Amino acid sequence: SMCGGFPHIPNKFKYKFSWSPLGVLRALNTPCKFIKNYKEETSDKAFRQISKMNFNGEEFEIYPNRDSTPYLKEYLSKEYIDKVKNFQRGTIRLKGWSKEWNKIFLKLDENSNLEKISSELWDKNKYQTNEKDRILLFVRFFAKYQNKIVYDKTLYIDESRNIENSAMSQCVSLTMVSVIECLIKNNTNPGISRIFNEINRVDFI
């Protein structure tokens, strides 16, 4: 399960900001955990686990987002969890992103002042009013039995918008609107609960 936002037309830095870069920096500086070859893999910083990904004929870079393992039970029944070979929730970036960000990674390694780095990045790489952003979000399930593919399905969103009505903001806000409508029309009980834990909510969305 991967998601990322980036410029519709790639810039040299391979990234632009529509709000404070501090959140991106903190996420990169955070430990991560995921499943690889049936085992839990960990890293003290997410940017140490960058890998390549091809999607619809386009090459991207990806890295894990914090701890993926608690989400296994959201995707799979309990009896299948121990049989999972690879499982990762992560962030998508444009091809060449890690090369352009190498100096930033070195500063993160040195525990430099994140607020200062954030301010510098914002000044140099924020979206301008005439630019477009792009989001790519996808979930892929891939299964084999006796070395044969028995299931392979991908659901995705690939959207670009003018930054004043950005694809990122639309993705977040439209999801929130759908959730609110679901709560109102399905007479949900008061309290905190996950929106997709009840079949009537899933069907509605």
Per-range role (PLM):
Residues 1-205:
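C-terminal catalytic/substrate-binding lobe primarily of soluble NAD(P)-dependent oxidoreductases
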